[in-house]
């Protein structure tokens, strides 16, 4: 095991991150810089967890993934988040549809909330209970279409 190898440092950072040690994870990722896209991705996940959304967006730039869309949403770019998740392979998953519903909620788009929740729930019925109490959808809790989707 070569502790000076940047990929090893990246993997050590991932281990620290899984253990919840964000400080050492960040240090390991920083020393692994230049080792490839995996390092930037791991740094971005840490950035999201630490609330550094603009840095996460930068580290995920061009990834067209769930996490890039999430980082954009959390940084306030609702349209960018929707474009990113819609263009990604993740957009066709249950969680991708759920994220689209959250983005729609933040945009005030009732039709988007309902249609995306229905799609998400059709792919993973377990999302019904999550959606029924998710504060992102509080504006729609009394809406008959929302209630029908999550029952």
Specify the residue positions occupied by each region the protein language model found:
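Short coil turns that delineate tetratricopeptide repeat
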Residues: 3, 34-37, 61, 90-93, ...
């Amino acid at each position: 095991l070569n502790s000076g190898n940047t990929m090893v440092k990246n993997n050590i950072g991932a281990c620290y991150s899984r253990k919840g040690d964000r400080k050492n994870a960040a240090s390991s990722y920083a020393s692994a810089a230049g080792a490839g896209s995996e390092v930037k991705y791991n740094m971005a996940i840490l950035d999201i967890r630490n609330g550094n959304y603009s840095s996460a967006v930068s580290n995920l730039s061009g990834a067209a993934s769930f996490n890039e869309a999430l980082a954009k949403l959390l940084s306030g770019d609702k349209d960018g988040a929707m474009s990113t998740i819609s263009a990604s392979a993740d957009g066709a998953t249950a969680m991708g549809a759920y994220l689209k519903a959250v983005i729609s909620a933040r945009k005030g788009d009732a039709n988007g909330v309902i249609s995306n929740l229905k799609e998400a729930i059709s792919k993973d019925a377990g999302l019904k209970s999550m959606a029924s109490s998710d504060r992102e959808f509080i504006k729609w809790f009394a809406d008959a279409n929302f209630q029908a989707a999550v029952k």
